[in-house]
Amino acid sequence: MDPFRFQVEARAGRARVGRLFTPHGAVETPLFMPVGTAGSVKGLMPKDLEAIGSQVLLANTYHLLLRPGPERVRALGGLHGFAGWKGPWLTDSGGFQVMSLGHMRRIDEEGVVFQSHLDGRLIKLTPERSIAVQEALGADLIMAFDECPPYPSPREYLEASLERTLRWLERSLKAKTRPDQALFGIAQGGTDPELRRRSTLETIRFDLPGYAIGGLAVGEPKEAMFAMVELSTRLLPEDRPRYLMGVGHPEDLVAAMGLGVDLFDCVYPTRTGRFGSALVPEGRLNLKNARFLEDRRPLEEGCDCYTCQTFGRAYLAHLVRAGEMLGGILLSLHNLRHLHRLTEAARQAIREGRYGDFAREFARRRFGREVPPWFREALAAGGHW
């Protein structure tokens, strides 16, 4: 039997609950993946992540290629043996980090030559090299090498980029040798509907185990972003998981889940925590604010995370203002649990056929009377508003 299967178990409008089977266990979707950039989620141990309901972790190919190197990770048991997380892993292709972090020297048909942000050495990353690195790392879910254009980009560049990404997908697929890893293709096209449609349809032709919506959440307006998510989920096959890359704001998750997105990842919840802010249903609490210094309440009433069950806002505000490492750890733990509770509640609402009620209640608490048009339109397109 194929170690990778995806089955839809419940629907409400275009939202769906699914089960994704991998060699390291089955997971329920929609789900949010914490980002373990260098093989660890900053400040959190695997047992912490398991306790708060994390199901899949993401690691960055670019960072692990530079340090400690893929062959060392392979020799030490792959990510599952090396990093201590025994559940499923996903690795990205390295393309986005090359474009955003590396001092890129050249991009051509062969691949990308960039300068390491660590030591300045020149490194060449091609589709074949990206797949080889990801096979050495041993994640369950791996990504085809792609080019993520910045926003805004001229239409001519977007078109050339998406065509190159399709050719790189073909090369990624030919380079793949491990049957115990599932390769996802990434659709690009920016916010141009025609190019996004073309990229998505051409990517689907490869008949892959899953598909990613790439090139969004890079600075474009929310209206444009969700128009592309709506178009993409309408075109992508119903029987394969859909992954919206780099998206982690709660309101974005609620809108995208309503359109049928299954997988998400983002550094937002942990980075926000390290910067001293907590996610709550009304938005964010900036614990640097003096008004929290005598506030005994937990960050979020009803939250079952260790942070909320143990500490008040006053203590957390003290840690943040004192620059204590524990402050960022406790806030990161809460923020991830906040997103996991959100996806858990979404799955329950979908199973009970009331995703629209769930989304409207979320909007009432998050936005009050000023619900942004993009949010309403996305939910309406999913059959929930």
Curated annotation (Swiss-Prot):
Region (RNA binding): 246-252, 270-274
Cofactor: Zn(2+)
Residue positions binding Zn(2+): C303, C305, C308, H334
Keyword list, A-Z: Glycosyltransferase, Metal-binding, Queuosine biosynthesis, Transferase, tRNA processing, Zinc
Reactions catalysed according to its record: 7-aminomethyl-7-carbaguanine + guanosine(34) in tRNA = 7-aminomethyl-7-carbaguanosine(34) in tRNA + guanine
Keyword Ligase among record annotations: no
GO MF annotations in UniProt: metal ion binding; tRNA-guanosine(34) queuine transglycosylase activity
Keyword flag Glycosyltransferase: yes
Family of this protein: Belongs to the queuine tRNA-ribosyltransferase family.
Function: Catalyzes the base-exchange of a guanine (G) residue with the queuine precursor 7-aminomethyl-7-deazaguanine (PreQ1) at position 34 (anticodon wobble position) in tRNAs with GU(N) anticodons (tRNA-Asp, -Asn, -His and -Tyr). Catalysis occurs through a double-displacement mechanism. The nucleophile active site attacks the C1' of nucleotide 34 to detach the guanine base from the RNA, forming a covalent enzyme-RNA intermediate. The proton acceptor active site deprotonates the incoming PreQ1, allowing a nucleophilic attack on the C1' of the ribose to form the product.
Name recorded for this polypeptide: Queuine tRNA-ribosyltransferase
Species of the source: Thermus thermophilus (strain ATCC BAA-163 / DSM 7039 / HB27)
Taxonomic path: Bacteria, Thermotogati, Deinococcota, Deinococci, Thermales
